[in-house]
Curated annotation (Swiss-Prot):
Species whose genome carries this gene: Methanosarcina acetivorans (strain ATCC 35395 / DSM 2834 / JCM 12185 / C2A)
Protein name, per record: Glutamine--fructose-6-phosphate aminotransferase [isomerizing]
GO biological process, one term: carbohydrate metabolic process
Assembly with partners or alone: Homodimer.
Keywords from the UniProt entry: Aminotransferase, Cytoplasm, Glutamine amidotransferase, Repeat, Transferase
EC class name: transferase
Catalytic activity: D-fructose 6-phosphate + L-glutamine = D-glucosamine 6-phosphate + L-glutamate
Coiled coil: none
Domain Glutamine amidotransferase type-2, residue spans: 2-226
Enzyme Commission no: 2.6.1.16
Highest taxon in the source lineage: Archaea
Active-site feature positions: 2 (nucleophile), 613 (for fru-6p isomerization activity)
Length: 618
């Protein structure tokens, strides 16, 4: 959840690091800091936005090697003393480092190091690493003579550490070097000319270089302005593949929109089109998923699909569960990743695990995938980030071709995740002779219409804005849906919570009478997703239930539905579509409703409080 950057080059390090940290702001943070090797270690920190850090840094700060960090508090409250970098070896110190991850045995290590004379100035787990590295190099807190190089001392320290980490470390005695290490937390190296970079995310340095190397678990690296050396866990040099990032940095700019989120809602038209490209054939009535390392015979033999996901991705997975069971006739379970490892899952032969993660770095999802792989279960990852950790660990990978998503609240990655789940379920159904090629041809025709239908919704966003502004000060919202619309109700409520800080709950509409209806007050806004389908009549009954309690009902319904207007206060329209695909349209309305509510409430839409884009700690 934190952002790490490192620089070794020919230019002044501080401006490069500050620029890179700003590119990582979308990950969420509460404080920031940098260290530059100038006349020894020089460290500057600040609470709050990066602009607060900038005013602390001297304009004439020299040094061409440095590290930086945006912190999201996990151990210790947001404060200057808890902000990274953390140093060891006196003031200003011999060692300085930044860390993303969690050290699980830090209390035992802290007690040990305190007994050896090390003084702790923060409440963080990270400071333990700084002192431990210092101890292995200098022997004691006031040690002046190095017994070994920084890389060797780091390797020895890592043998004592339990937990996850991405580390960037500097030593005052090795002024031209930046040393890195990784386990269970993302870290990537950017290769420049006369300069090299390190970061949690390629976005940090993409305007400097497109050539990158991804650091794997248990690898260490040494960067200088002119060289990059990478080593395995035994310390042997490794040759690594250089990958080129193809997408443009301009794709991550706002392009005239007020917020990234609004831009990304609009980009769903292109994102879904790109995700479908090369994967469907109307003429043949077939779906092509060449990245899927499963034969047709293996697909026929599947007895179970296990979906693993968190947050918005879990909502996509819940809809996927309905699709796999309804279309392909395959039993499907879905688990929240943070719970999965602790319930001793019963595994069966013929199970396919599908892990859904926007970033490919979600710590809980990676842990769940590793757990299920211990049962020799084949794994398929659905992610948006090429080269992310999950792409290197799963057996198969399907990419949502959504492009970079900067807004913390997921929009286009959600609809492209759904798109891939539709393709998977229909492909499995076709292979298992549950759907005919003629049906698949018709389905593909309808699916290809979705981007244009989303554009129609975007063209009427003023009506959604007007509705949102009318209820922006409401204290609580209900979102109701049945069957395929239930996951969309959950996602709509989550969007509103995330960016407008309004209490909102999504419910299966049939569950209202089992308790939630007691919460309804006069005028409570209830968003009812009531597109036509097999549960439409029951949904109308639920709407009548809440209207009888004087709730204000906002319906999401198709543009040919005249019946709905008799029972609700406002109708937000979507184009008429196949019942199966209606969720792809309804969610766009709810994304816009959340956006305009947050805008009316003057909230921080792209970087909501207390949230991070990439959740890389468990």
């Amino acid at each position: 959840m934190c952002g790490i950057v490192g620089y070794a080059g020919r230019n002044a390090a501080a401006p490069v690091i500050i620029e890179s940290l700003k590119k990582l702001e979308y990950r969420g943070y509460d404080s920031a800091g940098i260290t530059v090797l100038s006349k020894g270690i020089e460290t500057y920190k600040a609470v709050g936005k990066i602009v607060n850090l900038e005013v602390e840094i001297p304009k004439n700060l020299g040094g061409t090697v440095g590290i930086g960090h945006t912190r999201w508090a996990t151990h210790g409250r947001p404060s200057t003393k808890n902000a990274h970098p953390h140093n060891s070896g006196g003031n200003p110190g011999k060692i300085s480092l930044v860390h993303n991850g969690i050290i699980e045995n830090y209390m035992a290590l802290k007690e040990q190091l305190t007994g050896e004379g090390y003084v702790f100035n923060s409440e963080t787990d990270t400071e333990v690493i700084a002192h431990l590295v210092h101890k292995h190099i200098y022997g004691k807190p006031d040690g002046k003579e190095a017994k070994c190089e920084l890389l060797v001392g780091l390797r020895e320290a890592l043998k004592e550490i339990e937990g996850s980490y991405a580390l960037a470390i500097l030593s005052a005695d090795e002024p031209g070097k930046l040393v890195l290490a990784r386990k269970d937390s993302p870290l990537v190296i950017g290769l420049g000319k006369g300069e090299n970079f390190a970061a949690s995310d390629v976005t940090a340095f993409l305007n400097h270089t497109r050539d990158v190397v991804f650091v794997n678990d248990f690898e260490t690296a040494v960067l200088s302005p002119t060289s990059v050396e990478i080593f395995d866990r035994e310390g042997k040099p490794r040759e690594k593949k250089i990958e080129k990032i193809e997408w443009d940095f301009e794709a991550a700019e706002k392009a005239g929109y007020e917020h990234f989120m609004l831009k990304e809602i609009h980009e769903q038209v292109t994102a879904i089109h790109n995700t479908l490209a090369g994967k469907v054939s109307e003429l043949e009535g077939d779906i092509y998923l060449k990245e899927l390392n499963l034969s047709e015979d293996e697909i026929r033999k599947l007895a179970r699909v296990q979906i693993l996901a968190c947050g918005t991705s879990w909502h996509a997975g819940l809809l996927g569960k309905y699709l796999f069971e309804q279309l392909a006739g395959i039993h499907c379970d879905i688990d929240i990743c943070s719970e999965y490892r602790y319930r001793n899952p019963v595994m069966n032969e013929g199970t396919l695990a599908i892990a859904i993660t926007q970033s490919g770095e979600t710590a809980d999802t990676l842990a769940a995938v590793r757990e299920i792989m211990s049962y020799n279960c084949p794994t398929l990852a659905i992610t948006n980030v090429v080269g992310s950790t999950i792409t290197r660990e799963a057996n198969s990978v399907l990419y949502t071709r959504a492009g970079p998503e900067i807004g913390v609240a997921a929009t286009k990655t959600f609809t492209t995740q759904l798109t891939l789940l539709y393709l998977l379920a229909v492909k499995f159904a076709l292979v298992r002779d549950r759907l005919s090629p003629d049906y698949v041809k018709s389905f593909i025709t309808d699916l290809r219409k979705v981007p244009g239908q989303i554009q129609q919704i975007l063209n009427q966003k003023e009506a959604i804005k007007e509705c949102a502004e009318g209820f922006a000060r409401s204290k609580s919202y209900f979102f109701l849906g049945r069957h395929l619309n239930y996951p969309i109700a959950l996602e709509g409520a989550l969007k509103l919570k995330e960016i407008s800080y309004v209490h909102a709950e999504g419910f299966a509409a049939g569950e209202l009478k089992h308790g939630p209806i007691a919460l309804l007050d006069e005028g409570t806004p209830v968003v009812a997703i009531a597109t036509r389908g097999q549960t439409y009549e029951k949904m109308l009954s639920n709407i009548k239930e809440v209207k009888a309690r004087d709730a204000f009902v906002i319906a999401v319904a198709d543009n040919k539905d005249t019946e709905i207007t008799k029972y609700v206060d406002v109708v937000l329209r979507v184009p008429q579509s196949d019942e199966l695909l209606a969720p792809l349209l309804s969610i766009v309305v709810l994304q816009l409703l959340a956006y305009y509510t947050a805008l009316a409430r003057n909230c921080s839409i792209d970087k909501p409080r207390n949230l991070a884009k990439s959740v890389t700690v468990e």
